[in-house]
């Protein structure tokens, strides 16, 4: 390193100092997911919350990504963000992985998917049945919150999407919470309190199934159609009459954990 002595003080040459800073700025893994809004599912779905991939930092899609050995994008319904990031923003990432992102059949057939596939080392989707794309459910299933969930204290609870529930019929006296309220721990505790869970939230649906609760899903778009075993569904105005049809789906939690662990091992083999 070049050292300059000026007036009795030590100064490092500017060029060498910049190199030194870049060396120490290097992280092992950049986890990139949607962080701009207070959506509990978006914050909970990054695999960085559950898997050890070395020294890491979390970033939103709008942030600059520093030099890193690995960039992990996802999860969440963020396909367009992923296309942009893998095309323009990840030049300093040695390896790139898309983990459990919502990818529809239309997305899969798009030029955007071709760009993602060409720019990434591994690509997976939380959507079941997408041809040519590995199925890996949302990594939030790895949370230990599902291992010690409380027993139900209500017959039915309503877990709503904070921005998509205006047309949702309400039932007087039914406990209700939305996906912009508190942490994942708060959400799972509330969802677990219902023997039956009515929800129009993707993660509300997923977490209720992971908990083994009966679920009645009130979808607002097609992303709810791609679970490995879809829940019973109802419309926003007639769901109270359909509560009796709610069903549980067996094996959702262990299956999700196995598939995430297997994908984690593939990621480890990259680095």
Language-model features, listed with the residues they occupy:
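Active-site anion-handling motifs in enzyme catalytic cores
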Residues: 1-271
